[in-house]
Swiss-Prot record:
The keyword Magnesium does not apply. This is Integration host factor subunit beta. The lineage of its organism: Bacteria, Pseudomonadati, Pseudomonadota, Alphaproteobacteria, Rhodobacterales. The gene is ihfB. CDD domains: IHF_B. It comes from Jannaschia sp. (strain CCS1). Signal peptide: none annotated. GO terms for molecular function: DNA binding; structural constituent of chromatin. InterPro entries: Hist_DNA-bd (IPR000119), Histone-like_DNA-bd_CS (IPR020816), IHF-like_DNA-bd_dom_sf (IPR010992), IHF_beta (IPR005685). It comes from the Bacteria.
């Protein structure tokens, strides 16, 4: 599912809302999650999961094409840990 499909589904399930309002809400939620992660905060959606940022240390990598050693800079990457309700649903256990 992509963002536009999510917006369409939510609009269909909530006919009292205009699609452009649903789009604003979805975009606002994503922006708030991104802003919180950029600030170094953890975002927890109970039952669904938690988003956080992990630091990857600098390291020496290898170019797979040439075999040459390359320096990979330190970076921060998003991390998602699925919540219990999500894991249970994916494994066929209804909650």
């Amino acid at each position: 599912m992509i963002r536009s499909e999510l917006i369409q589904k939510l609009s269909d399930e909530n006919p009292h809302l205009y699609q452009r309002d649903v789009e604003r809400i979805v975009n606002s939620i994503f922006e708030e999650v991104i802003d919180a992660l950029a600030a170094g905060d953890r975002v927890e959606l109970r039952g669904f999961g938690a988003f956080s940022v992990k630091k990857r240390d600098a390291r020496i990598g290898r170019n797979p094409r040439t075999g040459e050693s390359v320096s990979v800079e330190e970076k921060h990457v998003p991390f998602f840990k699925a919540g219990k309700l999500l894991r249970d649903r994916l494994n066929g256990h209804e909650s």
